[in-house]
């Protein structure tokens, strides 16, 4: 009888220990340098994860390939990335699952994605670009490449366009190369566009940029959040709390004046988009040019978006295995 009590007591203690560890585990998450990641970064800065009783470690990696490798090797528990990269990761490691998406809507005076060139160095119109052999800098196997493909197809370029691409795995590196006029034409996102357009050395004029396209008519895609299935299985409560904190951050960001966001969250923005940058070294003109978008609450990845991107990736030869929506998407944890 005494022995039975000990067995039961041991089982209860083990169960309690397991319950305590579930919320005490640290979620190791890497964010890409895109606006959709800001709610996660602000949730950490504002203590919203702490308020939910979870520990989140944000790991700064701007290189897509390095971020994917860290996730696939178990050095990260989750990453935020674009849909194309997320599906590519899921195809490479069957123990990954997309648990939600982050969506932002640009303000009326801003453009989230642009095809740009330097006047006098690159083509000055899209029509002129299509008649040249100039290289186009773009992030490799990403939604930016997907949207560039759709843009060129809509303008009658159906063959040979991939030979024109100069691929990058790091969005920050692409922005730096374009700013230095090493790449004549590039697909860039905000806030890199505003930064490049306004930054200039002392006693020099700002760069003269040509907007070849703002991707009007090309449907934009959300950012996706990918978790390791083992983490989801063992710490479902942390995943749910993570999304609650992100939803709270979205509401707070949307209700906070832009000036306050930039002032209070400057370190957050710089840490995400310009790793290692000194606040004092960022020109005020560049900060003033950054337009904070409106954010939407975390949402599921739609089956329509999933099917469109999978089809594109298969045609490009990026996906060889068949991916099923139900196998790589789990929407149970969204608020």
Where are these regions (language model features)?
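Short, glycine-/small- and polar/acidic-enriched structural segments
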Residues: 26-160, 164-167, 184-190, 208-212, ...
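Secondary-structure end/capping motifs
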Residues: 233-318
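Bacterial N-terminal signal peptides
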Residues: 8-18
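Bacterial N-terminal signal peptides that target proteins for export
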Residues: 1-9
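Pocket-lining segment of extracytoplasmic ligand-binding domains
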Residues: 84, 172-272
